[in-house]
């Protein structure tokens, strides 16, 4: 991987994120302000995470099903191959007119490095946004990702509107293979390992399965002193199939549950490009 390859991918990804950083489709009602935090728990020399897509919905938005092709789930393929959340953002907005979603950006250029965390605050309606879903690409890879396939897996509010919250860890055994690209792990076709453009991998035409892990001698042994700001980039700690390997932690906390007006149906887009953020990003680097 070289600086140009990494930089080009980061610029393209950041542009896509700016187009769909926050989308809200809530009606005037009682709102709760939530803080959503994702932390990359990978060890030193571990893998990176692309900016995570998160969504609050009524429990009907299905991101994927194991054993099924992503062709049947609009928007997720571009995320699992290239970390691009824009198509998923559009699909969610179309399917969930009362849903609330965001893409969690890091303090600096994407992606989220090992030991780094970032937070967003969002206003949601407990009556229509009881459940939480997430998705992020694990990189470098061809189409490895983490996401919840069960839309009812994370209940944030009960039927009475009481806040339940969430605090959970995604293990390496939960990393999935999108089945859309062959896992050749070649630089030209592997995101953040030298790929110059999106959607350049070899089509696999497969289904979503548990990821078999990265290949020893390719990604797991990659060291390139010119890759990341002139610093060595070593993925020898990126074997997420190792027992007990932790990939990410998600936390959802209640910041405020005061009754207030939520925007009438509409879309708030491009907050990053406009210079305003509803996010309170925090970054913590893992100490060596």
Feature map (PLM): residue ranges:
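Sec/Tat signal peptide C-region and signal peptidase I cleavage site
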Residues: 24-31
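Short, charged juxtamembrane terminal tails flanking transmembrane helices
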Residues: 284-288
């Amino acid at each position: 991987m070289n600086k140009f390859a990494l930089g080009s991918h980061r610029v393209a990804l950041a542009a896509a994120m700016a187009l769909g950083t926050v989308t809200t489709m809530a009606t005037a009602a009682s709102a709760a302000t939530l803080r959503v935090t994702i932390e990359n728990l990978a060890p030193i020399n571990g893998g990176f995470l692309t900016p995570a897509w998160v969504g609050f919905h009524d429990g009907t938005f299905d991101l994927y099903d194991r054993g099924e092709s992503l062709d049947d789930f609009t928007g997720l393929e571009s995320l699992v191959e290239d970390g691009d959340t824009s198509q998923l953002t559009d699909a969610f907005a179309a399917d969930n007119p009362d849903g609330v979603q965001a893409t969690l950006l890091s303090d600096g250029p994407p992606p989220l490095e090992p030991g780094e965390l970032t937070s967003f605050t969002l206003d949601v309606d407990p009556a229509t946004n009881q459940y939480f879903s997430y998705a992020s690409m694990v990189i470098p890879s061809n189409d490895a990702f983490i996401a919840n396939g069960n839309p009812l897996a994370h209940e944030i509010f009960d039927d009475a509107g009481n806040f339940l919250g969430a605090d959970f860890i995604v293990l390496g055994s939960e990393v999935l293979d999108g089945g859309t690209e062959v896992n050749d792990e070649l630089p030209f076709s592997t995101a953040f390992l030298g790929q110059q453009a999106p959607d350049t991998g070899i089509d696999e035409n497969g289904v979503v399965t548990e990821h078999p892990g990265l290949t020893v001698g390719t990604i797991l042994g990659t060291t390139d002193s010119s890759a990341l700001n002139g610093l060595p980039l070593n993925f020898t700690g990126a074997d997420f199939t190792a027992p007990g390997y932790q990939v990410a932690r998600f936390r959802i906390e209640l910041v405020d549950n005061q009754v207030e007006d939520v925007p009438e149906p509409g879309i708030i887009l491009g907050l990053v490009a406009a210079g305003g953020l509803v996010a309170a990003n925090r970054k913590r680097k893992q100490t060596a």
